[in-house]
Regions:
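Charge-patterned, long linear interaction tracts outside catalytic cores
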Residues: 219-243
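A residue-level signal for conserved active-site and pocket-lining positions in enzyme catalytic cores
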Residues: 31, 63-64, 96, 106, ...
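Conserved beta-strand scaffold positions in the cores of enzyme catalytic domains, especially
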Residues: 26-30, 92, 167
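Short loop/turn segments immediately following beta-strands, especially the blade-tip
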Residues: 15, 111-113
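Mg2+-dependent endonuclease catalytic cores in nucleic-acid-processing enzymes, primarily RNase H-like
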Residues: 107, 115-215, 236, 240-242
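ATPase catalytic-site recognition across NTP-hydrolyzing enzymes
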Residues: 37-95
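Gly/Thr-rich phosphate-binding beta-strand-loop-beta motif of the actin/hexokinase/Hsp70
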Residues: 86-110
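ASCE P-loop NTPase helicase motor core
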Residues: 1-51
Length: 243
């Protein structure tokens, strides 16, 4: 549903999947095998029905021509919307950096190890921020709570620390992305209801190939920040942390 065609011709106009008719000068014509059942063999129909039972999401997309709510081969399916940190657990933060095209992000996390739940809240998703901007946002949101950030930016981390943010860089190593993903997949992820940019990333962060541990380098700005802080807590600061 992130495709520009969906955004322009469906979402912006309030057009539902499967609609037929003319809206704002655009003709919508949607047909499926259900409109031609009389001319199909029993075997073809049985194949379609079997897919409907076995994989309803794929059936709705491939057979009925609907738009996917999440990308094919998406990495994370173990998440839902919910209240953030209802039990008052310790909150710490992850941060990733961009500038012009890539967003700067700040993600709050509370981890319930006994219930295997990670509570997640989006605090920042914005491009074009300078060091002072980041410090001000971090100070307002986090106070003196810990931030684990992208260690590829040591100068920026040092500057934010000198200004007063309680911030440190993550550790990196071979296989760190896969390790971080595995940690997140082993927990239930509960996303605060207004964290829409993280939801978009969770719905679109995908494997590069089926059966591989390689990931498409896109839709990952908040998820990188999430990996930094969860790996710090769940892998231990003495072990490899994710990028």
């Amino acid at each position: 549903r992130e495709h520009w065609v969906y955004k322009r011709f469906f979402e912006s106009k309030g057009v539902r999947d499967g609609s037929n008719g003319s809206i704002d000068g655009v003709n919508y014509i949607h047909t499926t095998y259900l409109d031609n059942v009389a001319n199909l063999s029993k075997g073809v129909i049985a194949t379609m029905e079997r897919m409907r039972v076995d994989d309803i999401d794929n059936y709705n997309n491939v057979i009925l021509g609907g738009w996917r709510a999440r990308a094919e081969g998406v990495v994370f399916t173990n998440w839902r919307f919910g209240d953030f940190n209802p039990d008052g657990l310790q909150v710490t933060y992850g941060q990733d950096y961009g500038f012009k095209n890539d967003a700067n992000t700040l993600v709050g996390v509370a981890i319930d190890k006994s219930k295997k739940i990670i509570y997640i809240q989006e605090h920042l998703y914005q491009t074009g921020l300078n060091t002072h901007d980041l410090y001000t946002i971090n100070n307002k949101v986090c106070g003196r709570d810990l931030i684990v950030a992208d260690s590829a930016e040591p100068r920026l981390i040092s500057e934010l620390s000198s200004k007063g943010n309680n911030i440190r860089g993550c550790k990196k190593g071979p296989g760190s992305i896969s390790a971080g993903v595995s940690i997140l997949q082993s927990y239930e992820l509960v996303l605060e209801n207004n964290s829409k940019n993280i939801a978009t990333e969770l719905n679109n962060y995908a494997y590069a190939d089926k059966g591989s541990n390689l990931f498409v380098d896109d839709y990952n700005h908040s998820l990188d920040a999430l990996r930094y802080i969860t790996s710090f807590h769940l892998m231990g600061s003495s072990k490899i942390e994710v990028r």
